[in-house]
From Swiss-Prot:
Natural source organism: Cupriavidus necator (strain ATCC 17699 / DSM 428 / KCTC 22496 / NCIMB 10442 / H16 / Stanier 337) (Ralstonia eutropha)
Sigma-54 factor interaction domain ranges (all copies): 341-570
Domain of life: Bacteria
Keywords: Acetoin catabolism, Activator, ATP-binding, DNA-binding, Nucleotide-binding, Transcription, Transcription regulation, Two-component regulatory system
Residue positions binding ATP: 369-376, 433-442
GO molecular function: ATP binding; ATP hydrolysis activity; sequence-specific DNA binding
Record field: compositional bias (Low complexity): 586-606
SUPFAM superfamilies given in the database record: GAF domain-like, Homeodomain-like, P-loop containing nucleoside triphosphate hydrolases
Name of the protein this chain belongs to: Acetoin catabolism regulatory protein
Length: 668
């Protein structure tokens, strides 16, 4: 403890005892009433001891994430305000903090080279600055009083913090609740508190900007009234904001509007602005609001307050209409990567036509379909068809990564940032996808505590590795996929509703394989992909029928496995029913098992070669041309004689002599 800290402690002790008359204290203690009242709260209400110096408390990562998730929507809106404010003060040594209503720093922008000093001083992500915990400080005292203020150097209660200068302003939600604190602080500053006058003014201005941005987003479905004493600013920078429901009742306001209208209500006990009717507070009729839309000159939009008669300029925004889809445009050319996914199935073709319009759109895409229906194929095709094709395509199966590892796998981590973390740290998969496409398969299985962190990636274009205080910017396209009903997961509380709407910019539903009409094309395509160059795999009609009758619960993945198995076990490149896996090679579901006895009853229909499929008719032509010389035909078509026998039996082809009871067909 140095001399300055010892003297500060003595000053706080004197100010918080009631032994000396206030006039005497005023001569000795050059601190305003707000600071002295805060010191007294620290001692008499919170039980803090000024002689016990405590460094700033930094919350561990899991606790910090809980606080961030609770204020996540508001923090995303505030982020632009933080960045703009930091741009104004960065060269002066300040950092910008956003805290929640408990005083926990949930967002922070500062100079990277000063990280160690800022963390030690508590001007850092996760720092807890409540008045009951840290004593008199800008964040905590602004929370306690609801006022914007500067706590400069020796204004702080705890002598640990007396080198700091901190200026904070409260942020209120649209119902008047104190929701957050905006703060700019510096490790060092001039001795005079007056040097922070500009800082206080800027914090107030940006706090109002953030409040207004949050208001406009929260009440975009309501009537919004913008008011200002100057007509030039009523549209671009309104001082007062009100939201009305369809009945003309006030359902929201910014902080300045609340203070103004509480005065109009006369300060009656229990009187609140919320629920008041527009016509009670303003000398105008609800049905006349249309005269105040911003299309009229601002100087013609004057309205009077009922009680005081004060005049304000008014601009009215009607409720935002739901976006209407534009009329269908002419069909766009299908990129090759997408066209390669279908053989003409109408339902899939429709989905791909929609996808073709969105390959370079910035909106996020959600693919829904059964397991194995081709969700990753579609995501990869969208990537290859887009301008990001030169960047990475990173596929992540959220259900396959253990829950204990998914955070560090996705977001990465700094060296030794948690138990088991390596000394070198790790780039997360989100960073690996920078400049390309991130495909999140089975997104419905992502743990809920990580969903808010993914939301930040989508909203801000930046990722925060585990253990880091500074986010890393990323530029990527996010495509998600699931076989779950995300709507049901949202209803069950297992999936964040705001994340669902972020991911669901456009939705594609893939048909299951059993519903597709291009099975034959798929079979040919898959067999061709897996065959050696110059070789050809064909399918018997009976095997093809079995494929068509199968229900394909595993969809494309199951079909690929079936065909790979059949190709491996078939003879001479010809897949027949016995070559199929057991699940398909048994009797066809609707076919009766053959019974022992004569091969054909006298009443059976006569053999008709014109009813044969194309392969059978071609085989008949070879046999007839050779005079039914089976060995010659087998050599000609490149198969063994036994294979030729099987094919003839399959198509019901017999030598004319054999059908007439004559000799066997010749083999020589």
């Amino acid at each position: 403890m140095d001399l300055r800290q010892r003297e500060h402690i003595e000053t706080v002790v004197q100010a918080t005892t009631y032994l000396a008359p206030p006039a005497v204290l005023a001569d000795r203690i050059a601190h305003d009433a707000i600071i002295q009242n805060s010191w007294r709260r620290c001692v008499h209400q919170y039980g803090l001891d000024p002689s016990r110096m405590q460094e700033a408390r930094i919350l561990p990562q899991p606790r910090l994430r809980e606080h961030q998730e609770r204020i996540d929507d508001f923090a995303r809106i505030a982020r632009h305000g933080l960045q703009s404010l930091y741009g104004q003060v960065a060269g002066l040594g300040y950092v910008v903090l956003l805290t929640d209503a408990q005083g926990v720093t949930v967002d922070y922008i500062g100079e990277a080279r000063s990280d160690a000093a800022l963390r030690h001083a508590g001007l850092y992500l996760g720092a807890e600055w409540s008045e009951s915990g840290a004593g008199t400080c800008a964040v905590g005292t602004a929370l306690a009083t609801g006022q914007a203020l500067t706590v400069h150097q020796a204004d702080h209660f705890d002598a640990t913090h007396i080198p700091l200068t901190c200026t904070a302003a409260p942020l209120f939600d649209t119902h008047g609740n104190l929701h957050a604190i905006l703060d700019i602080s510096a490790l060092t500053s001039p001795q005079a508190k007056d040097s922070q006058g500009l800082a206080l003014q800027m914090v107030r201005i940006y706090a109002a900007h953030i409040e207004n941005a949050n208001f406009l987003r929260a009440h975009r479905r309501d009537w919004i009234l913008k008011l200002n004493v100057a007509p030039e600013f009523v549209d671009v920078n309104p001082e007062y904001l009100l939201a009305l429901d369809e009945a003309g009742r006030i359902v929201g306001h910014n902080h300045r509007a609340r203070l103004m209208l509480e005065g109009e209500l006369g300060g009656a006990p229990g009187a609140t602005v919320l629920g008041q009717r527009f016509e009670t507070l303003f000398d105008a009729r609800l049905e006349d609001l249309g005269h105040y839309v911003y299309s009229r000159p601002s100087e013609q939009r004057l309205v009077a307050l009922t009680r005081s008669g004060g005049l304000l300029y008014l601009s009215v925004l009607p409720p935002a209409l739901r976006w209407q889809a534009p009329p269908a445009e002419t069909q766009v050319a299908m990129p090759d990567a997408l066209a390669a996914l279908t053989g003409g199935d109408a339902a899939l073709q429709l989905q791909l036509q929609r996808a073709a319009r969105l390959v370079d759109s910035p909106i996020n895409l959600l693919i829904h379909g059964e397991t194995g229906s081709g969700k990753e194929f579609l995501a990869k095709a969208l990537h290859l068809a887009s301008a990001r094709r030169g960047g990475p395509f990173v596929a992540v199966n959220c259900a396959a990564i253990p829950e204990t590892l998914i955070e560090s796998e996705l977001f990465g981590h700094l060296p030794n940032s948690f138990s088991g973390a390596g000394p070198r740290g790790k780039r997360g998969l989100i960073q690996e996808a920078d400049g390309g496409t991130l495909f999140l398969d089975e997104i419905g299985d992502m743990p809920r505590e990580l969903q808010s962190r993914l939301l930040r990636v989508l909203a801000e274009g930046e990722v925060l590795p585990v253990g880091a205080a500074r986010p890393v910017p990323v530029r990527l396209r996010v495509i998600s996929a699931t076989h779950h009903s995300l709507e049901q997961l949202v209803a069950d509380g297992r999936f964040r509703e705001d994340l669902y709407y972020r991911l669901n910019g456009a939705r594609f539903t893939l048909p299951p394989l059993r519903a597709r009409t291009d099975l034959d094309w798929l079979v040919r395509k898959l067999l061709q992909e897996g065959s050696a160059e110059g070789s050809e795999i064909t399918l018997s009609p009976a095997a093809r029928e079995r494929l068509h009758r199968h229900r394909w619960p595993g969809n494309l993945r199951e079909l690929r496995n079936v065909l790979e198995y059949a190709r491996a076990v078939c003879a001479d490149g010809y897949i027949d029913v016995p070559d199929l896996p057991d699940s398909l090679a048994g009797p066809a579901p609707s076919a009766a098992l053959p019974q022992p006895g004569p091969a054909q009853s006298p009443a059976a229909a006569p053999f008709d070669p014109h009813q044969l499929p194309p392969e059978g008719m071609l085989l008949m032509q070879y046999l007839r041309a050779s005079g039914w010389n089976l060995s010659a035909v087998a050599r000609q078509i490149g198969v063994s004689r036994m294979t030729l026998y099987r094919r003839m039996e399959r198509y019901g082809i017999q030598s004319p002599n054999r059908r007439d009871g004559g000799p066997e067909p010749t083999d020589a």
